[in-house]
Design a protein with these regions (language model features):
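Acidic, Mg2+-coordinating phosphoryl-transfer loop and its flanking beta/alpha structural elements
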Residues: 115-147
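Substrate-recognition element of Asp-dependent hydrolases with the DxDx(T/V) motif
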Residues: 43-46, 51-82, 88
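A short, conserved beta-to-alpha structural element at the edge of catalytic cores
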Residues: 21, 27-34, 135-151
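Short phosphate-binding/catalytic loops that engage adenosine nucleotides
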Residues: 63, 93, 132
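Active-site neighborhood of HAD-like aspartate-dependent phosphohydrolases
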Residues: 1-38, 129
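A short acidic, amphipathic alpha-helical/loop segment
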Residues: 50-57, 109, 123-130
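Hydrophobic/aromatic residues located in beta-strands of well-ordered beta-sheets
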Residues: 65-67, 97, 134
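Substrate-recognition "cap/lid" segment bordering the active-site pocket of phosphatases
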Residues: 70-114, 121-124
Length: 151
């Protein structure tokens, strides 16, 4: 979800005046991320540019589509899952939802007949190693072009 259909980075930068990648390896990120969660921000993120086009393509795809999204860690899993459910519902997105307490767990869903769209290179690498197909999302036009090669 984050970085593909909803804009976590944009909201984080707006709230804290810093890119999350600049704080991820610092104690500062944990404190700011906790504030982000407590502010219910995952429920109200802006949609990524052109995400509607991607969602429409996936709604019409000849295969089942599911959401696979990380809740960052176990202690925030329930809270972030609820916020992401609210976001999906408010945008009329009815795909089956799967939430995992850490992006490193996404690979557990990889199978030979699965395809993930994700904006994180490590997720893409892990998914492919686990046997699934993957599209490293950079923007909607490129992702749509890649999807059309599969369908």
């Amino acid at each position: 979800m984050d970085g593909v259909i909803c804009d976590f980075v944009g909201r984080y930068k707006k709230l804290f005046n810093v890119n999350p990648d600049q704080t991820r390896n610092k104690k500062e990120f944990g404190n700011l991320f906790n504030q982000f969660i407590q502010g219910q921000n995952f429920a109200t993120l802006e949609m990524m540019p052109h995400a509607g086009e991607l969602l429409e393509f996936l709604r019409n795809a000849p295969v089942p589509t599911e959401i696979l999204s990380s809740t960052a860690r176990q202690d925030s899993h329930e809270n972030i899952s609820k916020q992401k459910e609210i976001w999906l519902n408010s945008h009329g997105i009815t795909f089956k939802r799967n939430f995992v307490p850490g992006k490193q767990l996404k690979k557990e869903y990889a199978k030979e007949d699965t395809l993930i769209i994700d904006d994180t290179e490590t997720v893409i690498t892990d998914w492919r190693i686990a046997g699934g197909h993957a599209i490293w999302h950079r923007d909607v036009p490129n992702t749509l072009a890649m999807l059309k090669l599969y369908f």
